[in-house]
């Protein structure tokens, strides 16, 4: 094992503020030299490879692998465990291409032999100081891969390009100013010849955006600001300088429809939280899904889930792309289980609203969603004395990943039954401080519960539910497979498998750690594996050899 300096494919660093990292390398297997093709990235659904955060562009987290089935999943056992060593709460979904797994932990990137868990190379970069909110916790959800390169966002909003063969740094681009308290927690998305990124910091008083960079050179190709500037459509919500710190950050990866050539990206809450006097109106484009042209960054359409959000109901949950046949008509849909407690169905070609139904029982901020897609409010808003509001600040669901199985026709996701008392007290924006006005508390007798839900999109109804034991404080998501299975991270620290048709429990493995990530599946030499980040470790499971 030897230490090497990062290998620079470009002789300059594109960011004057960039910090060099180092790559530690062991003997790499031959498959580490493969190139990730456009066909690999556009394959839908995925099989042996898992080429992006959600597996494929659609966001369905569905694997065609079927070696592991309802009949043999009880034999599943841990094949290997890898400990990155620098994070206690991993949130990464591994990416696997031809037997090589890429994971992140804080600002570090690892390449592993996906069959054994053996370390191939390790790129190290120090964590940043002086950050706020989620970025200060150095959370990172994974990488993007393109040709012979690996791309990662750092906690201080740099985009790095690494050599997939060695882990050497090729270039480093600062795409948002740390001095303004931008950060990043997401995995990038590779589309065509560009890498698309977002930012965190919506509760820290920043202006959100989605940006695309040339995958070869790192040069910015376009940037779409999610808070409109003066004179732009929607700017009436942002008087004076309010647009500069209005939030609408983009802290989860989007999805992409190659046939429509459209990227779908979601945005966070408006800032300040809980008090809306300084941001009258709908507060575009907060709590939205945006349909963007990946070639130009121009907005095609948008849909806002929670106009004038006072509850911290980010819309950053995955916008999943599915096709259904309803009444003899094939529909290209975008569906989302939203943090506000409603399940939305949209036409992804133009954003037309098809309907929204509640999926939790604890819901009192709105009475319903009307025929135009707007909420009919109940009048419950944060107050100085405190107001009991459901869902609570963590939402009826959150960023933990959903999945969709085309064989069952069911959409799976984790829901949270929980409420909070919301308090409001206006205060001015101060650079360098979080922009909460003011906060929430959980009532002493409030019992939160996670529930695994299966939802039929054509029928617009819940089909089955699987309540979880625990405190409702884990953040694990779901994976569904052609083996008739649904894997998910439960609230007790276990990876669990149930029958995707009816939710019947079939297998579980307790990791002994809280799971704040979502499972994925891949194959090496014809053998199927299921992998998940649990606590500070990566676990990979397979049937006995």
Residue map of PLM features:
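Short coil/turn segments that connect the beta-strands within blades of beta-propeller domains
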Residues: 47-48, 98-100, 147-148, 192-194, ...
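N-terminal cofactor/phosphate-binding cores enriched in small/glycine residues
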Residues: 63-176, 480-481
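Short loop/turn segments that connect beta-strands within beta-propeller blades
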Residues: 114-116, 163-166, 215-217, 294-296, ...
């Amino acid at each position: 094992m030897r230490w090497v300096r990062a290998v620079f494919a470009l002789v300059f660093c594109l960011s004057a503020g960039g910090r060099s990292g180092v790559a530690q390398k062991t003997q790499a297997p031959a498959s580490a030299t493969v190139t990730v093709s456009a066909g690999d990235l556009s394959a839908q659904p995925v099989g042996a490879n898992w080429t992006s955060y959600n597996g494929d562009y659609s966001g369905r987290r569905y694997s065609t692998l079927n070696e592991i089935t309802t009949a043999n999943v009880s034999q599943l056992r841990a094949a290997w465990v890898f400990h990155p060593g620098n994070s206690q709460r991993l949130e990464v979904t591994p990416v696997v291409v031809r037997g090589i797994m890429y994971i992140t932990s804080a600002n570090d990137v690892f390449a592993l032999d996906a069959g054994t868990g053996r370390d191939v190379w390790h790129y190290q970069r120090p964590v940043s100081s002086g950050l706020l909110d989620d970025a200060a916790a150095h959370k990172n959800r994974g990488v993007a891969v393109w040709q012979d390169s690996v791309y990662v966002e750092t906690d201080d909003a740099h985009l790095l390009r690494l050599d997939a063969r060695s882990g050497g740094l090729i270039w480093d681009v600062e795409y948002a100013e740390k001095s303004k308290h931008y950060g990043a927690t997401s995995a990038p998305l590779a589309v065509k010849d560009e890498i698309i990124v977002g930012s965190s910091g919506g509760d820290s008083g920043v202006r959100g955006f989605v940006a695309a960079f040339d995958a070869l050179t790192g040069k910015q190709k376009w940037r779409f600001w999610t808070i409109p500037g003066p004179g732009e459509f929607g700017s009436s919500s942002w008087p004076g300088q309010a647009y500069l710190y209005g939030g609408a950050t983009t802290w989860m990866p989007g999805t992409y429809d190659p046939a429509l050539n459209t990227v779908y990206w979601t945005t966070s809450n408006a800032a300040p939280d809980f008090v809306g006097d300084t941001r009258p109106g709908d507060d575009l484009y907060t709590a939205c899904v945006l349909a963007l042209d990946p070639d130009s960054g121009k907005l095609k359409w948008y849909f806002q889930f929670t106009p004038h959000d006072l509850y911290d109901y980010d819309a950053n949950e995955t916008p999943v792309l599915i096709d259904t046949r309803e009444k003899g008509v094939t529909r290209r849909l975008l569906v989302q289980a939203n943090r506000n407690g409603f399940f939305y169905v949209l036409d992804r070609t133009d954003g037309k609203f098809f309907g929204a139904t509640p999926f939790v029982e604890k819901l009192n901020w709105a009475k319903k969603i009307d025929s135009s897609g707007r909420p009919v409010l109940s009048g419950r808003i944060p107050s100085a004395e405190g107001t009991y509001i459901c869902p609570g600040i963590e939402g009826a669901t959150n960023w933990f990943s959903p999945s969709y199985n085309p064989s069952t026709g069911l959409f799976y996701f984790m829901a949270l039954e929980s409420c909070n008392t919301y308090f409001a007290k206006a205060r001015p924006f101060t650079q360098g401080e979080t922009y909460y006005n003011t906060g929430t508390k959980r009532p002493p007798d409030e019992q939160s519960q996670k529930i695994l839900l299966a939802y039929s999109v054509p029928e617009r109804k819940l089909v089955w539910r699987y309540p979880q034991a625990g405190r409702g404080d884990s953040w694990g998501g779901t994976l569904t497979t052609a083996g008739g299975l649904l894997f998910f991270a439960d609230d007790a620290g276990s990876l669990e498998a149930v029958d995707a048709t009816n939710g019947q429990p079939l297998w579980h493995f307790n990791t002994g750690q809280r799971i704040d990530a979502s499972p994925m599946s891949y194959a090496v030499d014809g053998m199927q594996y299921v992998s998940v980040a649990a606590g500070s470790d990566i676990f990979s499971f397979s049937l006995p050899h």
